[in-house]
């Protein structure tokens, strides 16, 4: 078990919907197909079982999300996960932060940047490039109307290409959406503490 910092953790969390979910027994063939295409664990996730009430929206959402987060080229997968964790931390989405912190750790083989994001996102990043990515993610999350050419120039200074900046912007934007769905339609479920007997 990892440490919980300001309510955030890299532990595996559950998520419980506050609205009714679709029972697999009652799901239409289209709903089942959308679940299968969305995520490997969609059929056991309250989040997907809630969103599949509107299968066409979930189909589109999953396609866009998967293309942004897993598509080839552009920003590295680890950097996308770092930005997503930073957005989730700023938005207060404990569940999304835990998932994407784990993915960053798996891809980057380290936890230092994630620990920094959980502790103080404004100063997080182990390199100038990571700090620029996190700062841009925070700015686009907290003050999108103030992001301008100087923010893009700061990313370029740290070596980000235009394709990488576009990928980063997409990752930040999709998490504005994902975090809001998670925060308004349910709640994270922390694992039960192990007996100390």
What are the functions of these language-model segments?
Residues 1-197:
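Hydrophobic alpha-helical segments
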